[in-house]
Swiss-Prot record:
It comes from the Eukaryota. The active site is at 694 (proton acceptor). Its main location: membrane. This is Probable LRR receptor-like protein kinase At1g51890. The chain crosses the membrane at residues 501-521. Residues 20-500 are extracellular. GO terms for biological process: defense response to bacterium. It is a single-pass type I membrane protein. Its EC number is 2.7.11.1. InterPro entries: Kinase-like_dom_sf, Leu-rich_rpt, LRR_dom_sf, Malectin-like_Carb-bd_dom, Prot_kinase_dom, Protein_kinase_ATP_BS, Ser/Thr_kinase_AS. LRR repeats lie at residues 407-430, 431-453, 455-476. Glycans are attached at residues 45, 90, 138, 177, 251, 259, 284, 290, 327, 335, 397, 412, 417, 455, 460, 468, 481, 494.
Length: 876
């Protein structure tokens, strides 16, 4: 299938259609002049307007007149970009809304060079696709489904070689947020088919969302159609023509087969199949079939299309194929009297968008600064100010923290011919550390809001002769306490300020040099001491028989005697908890609260776990791993001393045992993100990598600020650093959270932790126990999948939340969790991917709490019961 190639034919002149509502449509005829006009394209009845208000660069042009009669009017003009490497369209939209975005590129020898262009297309800071024009009269269409992360969107054309980027039309169509849901990334269209041997191609207004449908019917199938109306009112709103036609096998006793292939065998796909029974079956007649994938994997069992009503079946988690081939077989069951059918098929490829946008407020501020000071002609000031780093705006420095948006940390507009007052928009750059506005023609007062910019340490306003020299009182206080340096011109009695500041900076620099020298000397001595005697673990003699096969722990750091443990716990006065390892007590050490875990006098395995935990915690440090304060290895007395986590474990907080306050959805997402970051650090930040092996809510502890930290590393195992992805080990863990593949094979990998974490995510969403024999499906994984067959997310969400959450965000978490608990470890995501997804879910909730204008439809789609296989589709 070459769907995008077929799309070019759609832009040929079609028959007239009737008008429908185009609310929310953005239809741009790129390069249209005069820019103020709009027109209605006759063959589609879509209203187009110029792109001029969405972009401030580029040159209008028109395709050669000889080609114009072959295409719809919005293709005749175009905009090319001979200047600058990146040129971007800017849209102000609503965050979290879902859009179909389509760019069309018809060369038509507009420049008379007969030179076929190639360039890249970006969505925000991420590459969307490479555009290569196949012929003078041909072109390219790029289409994707994308959820906005912020309330602005940039679509950029990036020059990659000697040819000039251009664009013919750009179209945005709002979609229902409950449709085309992914665990991550956006969707690029591979094919959108309805089953007919002949045209027409379908788009608006037959498709209210202006999706483009291509007719398709191969010689192994025949056409089934009806003149009766079909109910298409589920979330996907397929056109009537799609619903009223279907493909069935030529031989009614044979299965229906649909095959396609993708060039990129690593790509992930989502498949949407639309079904409706369009024959009037008698009472003793049945159409029932199974859907299998690539030779036997069950996709859907005993499926019966509803009578004259569309139902959509899709995979809740992306699928891939080892060789890039996708083969679907629709086979009659033994109960069926009629062959299988299918009415419509949509195939999408996942486009991951790993690069986060710069903070929204900072982007808005920079756009305002660009407009206020007339900086639109700066060729690099296009698109996202910081991302990707290769295209960062000239004059900016940015920081790029892990799993967080880029931040603008310095702005240099020195000598930029700025005039007028200093805009207060600069104060919205909350991460800004240095601001240079020197050598311009700025006037007016120094904004008092600069004093509220807590990260700002340097302001250079020198060379602005018309700027008011008075300094706001609040800003002067920061200058006086040395938290901010202000460089400005002075006259008269204050003329020495710049010199004084320069001298002060020089003095500080000299002190820093001296301190650096002292630090190097001290550090050198420390290394000499370390070289003379290691302060880690060494082999020694063990007194207890229970430890006869293990080394003792000998270190000079963090080691306490048993009497010191008695003192810090006041003779074990207050019990915090009990477990198989022993008892945890409250303690105080140097006026700091601690938790003391005393190991019971038991087996050699207990000591091994104790030793493993000490060894791990002495060498790993992360803000989301419980910190080890020290340990006791005194005769038969073994203890671990941890930082005290005031709010106890996650299970206690979810159940209400620790507090009557219900954990909000935002807090739950924050806890999930932080626990995932701790786990991701064990997998990727440690050398050698570590597997926790016992991830569960009771091992996720919360401090007084509800910050989450992973605890209990007694079962943790390390991996060799030679590329091994798994090790064979005796199965250990907690029933209900144990990876079934690990249990079956004894092969342990990081994906075993991913499985356990997926179970924890389901508990966070549902507040249900992992095992409950009174449920129809005892294990929480099976119960969630069973409950979601009706597409109603509310049926599983913790009722204590009182529906105070973003439904789309909950769906994303549940689908991520179900991907984590996939029985096959190879199909589970990695922890970095989990962290990225959860960060997006947290951002959705934070934006909702801050008053986002986005609205979502919460109804669910009716859906036939599915089997509980790996690929059971979810409905919504």
């Amino acid at each position: 299938m070459r769907f995008l190639s077929f799309l070019i034919f759609v832009f040929a002149v079609l028959g007239l259609v009737q008008a429908q509502d185009q609310s929310g449509f953005i239809s741009l005829d790129c390069g249209l002049v005069p820019t103020e006009i709009t027109y209605v394209e006759k063959s589609t009845n879509i209203t187009y307007r110029s792109d001029a208000t969405y972009i401030d660069s580029g040159v209008p042009g028109k395709i050669n007149e000889v080609y114009r009669t072959q295409f719809q009017q919005q293709i005749w003009a175009l905009r090319s970009f001979p200047e600058g490497q990146r040129n971007c369209y800017n849209f102000s939209l609503t965050a979290k809304r879902k859009y179909l975005i389509r760019g069309t590129f018809i060369y038509g020898n507009y420049d008379g060079l007969n030179q076929l262009p190639s360039f890249d297309l970006y969505i925000g800071p991420n590459k969307w696709t490479s555009v290569s024009i196949p012929g003078v009269r041909n072109g390219s269409v790029s289409e994707m489904i994308h959820v906005l992360r912020q309330d602005h969107l940039q679509i950029c054309l990036v020059k990659t070689g000697e040819t000039t980027p251009f664009i013919s039309s750009l179209e945005l169509r709002p979609l229902n947020n409950n449709t085309y849901v992914t665990k991550s990334g956006s969707l690029i269209v591979v094919a959108r088919l309805y089953f007919s041997p002949t045209p027409p191609f379908l788009r608006y207004d037959e498709d209210v969302h202006d999706r483009i449908w291509i007719p398709f019917l191969d010689n192994k199938n025949s056409l089934l159609s009806t003149e009766l109306s079909v109910d298409t009112s589920n979330f996907y709103n397929v056109p009537q023509t799609v619903a009223k036609t279907a493909a069935v096998p030529l031989n009614a006793t044979q299965p229906l087969k649909i095959n396609w292939s993708l060039d990129d065998i690593t790509s992930q796909s989502y498949i949407y199949m639309h079904f409706a029974e369009i024959e009037n079956l008698e009472a003793n007649e049945t159409r029932e079939f199974n859907i299998t994938y690539n030779g036997g994997e069950n996709w859907f069992s005993y499926f019966r299309p509803p009578k004259f009503r569309i139902t959509t079946v899709y995979n809740p988690a992306a699928v891939s194929s080892l060789d890039g081939n996708f083969n679907f077989t629709f086979s009659m069951t033994g109960n069926s009297t009629h062959p299988p059918l299918i009415n419509g098929l949509e195939i999408y490829q996942v486009l991951e968008l790993p690069q986060l946008d710069t903070y929204q407020d900072e982007v808005s501020a920079m756009m305002n600064i660009k407009t206020i000071y007339g900086l639109s002609k700066r060729s690099s000031w296009q698109g996202d100010p910081c991302a990707p780093e290769l295209y960062r705006w000239e004059g900016l420095n940015c920081s790029y923290p892990n799993f967080a948006p880029p931040q603008i940390i310095s702005l240099n507009l020195s000598g930029s011919n700025l005039s007028g007052t200093i805009t207060s928009d600069i104060s919205k750059l909350t991460h800004l550390r240095e601001l240079d506005l020197s050598n311009n023609d700025l006037s007016g007062d120094i904004p008092f809001v600069f004093s509220d910019m807590k990260n700002l340490t340097l302001i250079n306003l020198s060379g602005n002769k018309n700027l008011n020299r008075s300094v706001p009182e609040t800003l002067q206080k920061r200058i006086d306490n040395k938290s901010l340096t202000l460089i400005r011109d002075e006259t008269g009695k204050n003329s020495t300020n710049v010199v004084a500041i320069a001298a002060s900076v020089a003095s500080v620099f000299a002190v820093l040099v001296i301190l650096a020298i002292v630090f190097v000397v001290i550090r050198k001595k420390q290394r000499t001491n370390e070289a003379s005697g290691p302060r880690s673990f060494t082999t020694g003699t063990v007194k207890s028989d229970a430890r006869s096969s293990s080394s003792s722990i000998i270190t000079k750091e963090r080691k306490f005697t048993y009497s010191e443990v008695l003192k810090m716990t006041k003779n074990f006065e207050r019990v915090l908890g009990k477990g198989g390892f022993g008892t945890v007590y409250h303690g105080n050490l140097d006026d700091t609260q601690v938790a003391v875990k005393m190991l019971s006098h038991s087996s050699a395995q207990g000591y091994k776990e104790f030793k493993a935990e000490v060894e791990l915690l002495l060498r790993v440090h992360h803000r989301h791993l419980v910190g080890l304060v020290g340990y006791c290895d005194d005769g038969d007395n073994l203890a671990l001393i941890y930082e005290y986590m005031e709010k106890g474990d996650l299970r206690e907080n979810m159940s209400g045992k620790h507090s009557v306050n219900v954990l909000s959805w935002e807090t739950r997402m924050q806890i999930a993100v932080e626990a995932a970051q701790g786990l991701e650090y064990l997998h990727n930040g440690c050398r050698p990598p570590m597997v926790h092996r016992d991830v569960k809510p009771t091992n996720i502890l919360l401090n007084e600020r509800s910050q989450a930290k992973l605890a209990d590393f007694g079962l943790s195992r390390s991996f060799p650093v030679d590329g091994e992805s798994h090790v064979m080990t005796v199965v250990a863990g907690t029933p209900g959270y144990l990876d079934p593949e690990y249990y079956r094979t004894n092969w342990l990998s990081e994906k075993s932790d991913v499985y356990s974490f997926g179970v924890v995510l389901l508990e966070i969403v549902t507040n249900q126990p992992v095992m409950n024999k009174n449920r129809e499906r005892p294990h929480i994984n099976e119960w969630v999948m069973f409950m979601l067959t009706n597409g109603d997310i509310k049926s599983i969400v913790d009722p204590k939340l009182n529906e105070d959450y973003d439904t789309n965000g909950v769906w994303k978490v549940v689908e991520l969790a179900l991907a984590c608990v996939n029985p096959s470890s190879s199909r589970r995501p990695t922890m970095p991917h989990v962290v990225m997804e959860l960060n997006e879910c947290l951002a959705l909730e934070i934006e909702r709490k801050q008053g986002s204008q986005a609205t979502y439809i919460k109804e669910s789609v009716e859906f036939s019961p599915s089997s509980a296989s790996d690929f059971s589709p979810l409905a919504r």
